[in-house]
């Protein structure tokens, strides 16, 4: 897909993707990536949607992508901003910021099925884009690995929530931990499951 656009004079082509949209703790992480036109022999043969890769493979590809990319950027939007502006706004504005942070301006942007109004160049939302375009796959890996590292750091700061395991998603064990210990500054309190679990902790605290 990227080669067709570049052949039409619309390059360089950047892929953009996010990680953590569906989580209820931690940031949403968004990456933009421009890959070289020729990927032969650079070690990205297994590159696809980050969710279909093992953690070990993602970590290896993360380093390769950063080494070979023409340009890439990774940004994190906090839970506080998500609560303030909403996840959709955080996602779309974050994608604009990630593209703007590239040190090579793309001629065209491909996203994983997300419309991004306000970009200064044309863009195309691609259904299952992280499987269809290598630049989106690369952005997917960059976003996922960088966010996972953030959650592992938060797990060290706030042990007892299992953040390194579930990466901030709303598992039963995670919500039970919030109801027992209360939320952290990195939880998304605008999300009903977090608000309910935190309220349960507050009620128990008051009774105690």
Curated annotation (Swiss-Prot):
Q: Name one GO cellular component term.
A: cytoplasm
Name the SUPFAM superfamilies for this protein. Ribonuclease H-like
Q: Which UniProt keywords apply?
A: Cytoplasm, Endonuclease, Hydrolase, Manganese, Metal-binding, Nuclease
Q: Name one GO biological process term.
A: DNA replication, removal of RNA primer
Q: Which reaction does it catalyse?
A: Endonucleolytic cleavage to 5'-phosphomonoester
The cross-references to Pfam families, in alphabetical order and at most eight, read:
RNase_HII
Indicate yes or no for the key word Glycosyltransferase.
no
Q: Give the UniProt subcellular location, in the record's own words.
A: Cytoplasm
Highest taxon of the source? Bacteria
InterPro entries linked: RNase_HII, RNase_HII/HIII, RNase_HII/HIII_dom, RNaseH-like_sf, RNaseH_sf
Q: Matching CDD domains, A to Z?
A: RNase_HII_bacteria_HII_like (cd07182)
Q: Which EC class, in a word?
A: hydrolase
What this protein needs as a cofactor is: Mn(2+); Mg(2+)
Q: How is the cofactor bound?
A: Manganese or magnesium. Binds 1 divalent metal ion per monomer in the absence of substrate. May bind a second metal ion after substrate binding.
Q: What GO MF terms are annotated?
A: manganese ion binding; RNA binding; RNA-DNA hybrid ribonuclease activity
Its EC number is 3.1.26.4
Which residues participate in a divalent metal cation binding?
17-18, 112
Q: Where is the RNase H type-2 domain?
A: 11-203
The family annotation for this protein states: Belongs to the RNase HII family.
- Which NCBIfam families does the UniProt entry name for this protein? PRK00015.1-3, PRK00015.2-2
Q: What exactly does this protein do? A: Endonuclease that specifically degrades the RNA of RNA-DNA hybrids.
Protein name in UniProt: Ribonuclease HII
Record organism? Corynebacterium jeikeium (strain K411)
